[in-house]
């Protein structure tokens, strides 16, 4: 085991799963959403603690860490208040979760910390929230680094940019170099091209997650007139919604769109099961992408289960998938920490020899 990890705001376990695949031992995941418990525990074989972070005490988490392992604390605070998709409110309360994260860091004093979030967290409230968080870490003696990751550069097949922060007391952790270039980005075809044909409202018997939302008649007609990468402007006049005919509607070109086979997907959101919620139409089949396809584009393994058989709820699972840290990004974070620890151990070994 490389190190012992506790995952705050763990959701269904995207970050946890990436860490486990890279050899880390995850002691527990903490989240206040009880619907995530099944997927988290079923796929990761570790403990799910249903609590709000404000209810968590550092002493109870410290008791979980073994004495002979590096203590690692990771988390992805809910990002809706920071995201460009929710600019309406600039006075939200979810940023206070960073304050709670900072409190737990003070109480636990982990060896290594990692946080993943949207890039907008750096400028939210004129940068005050993020800068205060960094200052609190530095005051505790941590070396802090952060960078914006363009997910396709690391084999994640969607247009997703994420802020990744590291902090360690024994040096600076740097993110590993990119593994892909635009010439060999993983595409929609690479990831979902082999799945069975499906249809609007269809379920595939071999996988309950390969299920697509049922389209209303008008939306079925719309997707039949949609081309990959196109917009609602490609439709006949009678299919265009009145709101899109207004000047203000021109800025919503990606809604009711199809993905393109040989490009990366758009950002997978919490409403990725709906054709009208973004460019979530299948590249050639007349339907929205299925839940399994959305999960694969978030780099979850095909075997990842999100609900017990017969208890699948579209909106719940779609939200879980959209909120998740892509598993492959979890592996990038894990590899970056592992490389740092290997370098640290090598330096310590050299000192002993000398």
Curated annotation (Swiss-Prot):
Enzyme Commission number(s) of this protein: 2.1.1.37
Q: Pfam family example for this protein?
A: DNA_methylase
- Among its keywords, does the record have S-adenosyl-L-methionine? yes
What are the entry keywords?
DNA-binding, Methyltransferase, Restriction system, S-adenosyl-L-methionine, Transferase
- Give GO BP annotations, semicolon-separated: DNA restriction-modification system; methylation
Q: What is annotated as the active site?
A: 79
Entry GO MF terms: DNA (cytosine-5-)-methyltransferase activity; DNA binding
Where are the coiled-coil regions? none
Q: Where is the SAM-dependent MTase C5-type domain?
A: 3-344
Top-level EC class, please? Answer: transferase
Reactions this protein catalyses: a 2'-deoxycytidine in DNA + S-adenosyl-L-methionine = a 5-methyl-2'-deoxycytidine in DNA + S-adenosyl-L-homocysteine + H(+)
InterPro entries per the record?
C5-Methyltransferase (IPR050390), C5_DNA_meth_AS (IPR018117), C5_MeTfrase (IPR001525), C5_meth_CS (IPR031303), SAM-dependent_MTases_sf (IPR029063)
Q: Which family does this protein fall into?
A: Belongs to the class I-like SAM-binding methyltransferase superfamily. C5-methyltransferase family.
* Functional description taken from the UniProt entry: A methylase that recognizes the double-stranded sequence 5'-GTCGAC-3', methylates C-? on both strands and protects the DNA from cleavage by the HgiDII endonuclease.
User: Per its UniProt record, what NCBIfam families does this chain match?
Assistant: dcm
Q: What name does the UniProt record give this protein?
A: Type II methylase M.HgiDII
Q: To which species is this protein native?
A: Herpetosiphon aurantiacus (Herpetosiphon giganteus)
């Amino acid at each position: 085991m490389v190190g012992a990890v506790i995952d705050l705001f763990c959701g269904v376990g995207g970050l946890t799963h990436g860490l486990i695949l890279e050899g880390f031992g995850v002691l527990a995941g903490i989240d206040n959403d009880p619907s995530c418990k099944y997927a988290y525990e079923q796929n990761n074989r570790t403990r799910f603690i249903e609590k709000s972070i404000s209810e968590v005490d550092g002493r109870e988490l410290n008791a979980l860490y073994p004495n002979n392992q590096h203590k690692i604390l990771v988390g992805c605070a809910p990002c809706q208040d920071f995201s460009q998709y929710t600019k309406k409110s600039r006075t939200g309360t979810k940023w206070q979760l960073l304050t709670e994260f900072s409190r737990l860091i003070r109480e636990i004093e982990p060896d290594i910390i990692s946080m993943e979030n949207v890039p907008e967290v750096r400028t939210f409230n004129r940068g005050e929230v993020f800068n205060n968080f960094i200052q609190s870490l530095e005051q505790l003696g941590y070396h802090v680094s952060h960078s914006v990751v363009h997910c396709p550069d690391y084999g994640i097949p969607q247009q997703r940019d994420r802020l990744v922060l590291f902090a360690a007391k024994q040096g600076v952790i740097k993110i590993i170099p990119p593994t892909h270039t635009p010439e060999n980005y993983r595409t929609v075809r690479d990831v979902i091209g082999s799945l069975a044909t499906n249809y609007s409202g269809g379920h595939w018997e071999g996988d309950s997650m390969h299920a697509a939302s049922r389209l209303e008649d008008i939306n079925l007609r719309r997707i039949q007139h949609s081309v990959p990468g196109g917009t609602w402007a490609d439709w006949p006049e009678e299919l265009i919604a009145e709101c899109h005919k207004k000047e203000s509607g021109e800025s919503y070109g990606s809604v009711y769109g199809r993905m393109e086979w040989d490009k990366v997907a758009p950002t997978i959101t919490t409403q990725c099961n709906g054709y009208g919620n973004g460019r979530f139409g299948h590249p050639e089949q007349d339907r929205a992408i299925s839940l399994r396809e959305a999960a694969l584009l978030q780099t979850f393994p095909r075997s990842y289960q999100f609900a017990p058989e017969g208890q699948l709820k579209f909106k719940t699972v779609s939200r879980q998938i959209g909120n998740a840290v892509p598993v492959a990004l979890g592996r990038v974070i894990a590899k970056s920490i592992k490389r740092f620890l290997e370098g640290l151990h090598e330096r310590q070994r050299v000192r002993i020899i000398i």
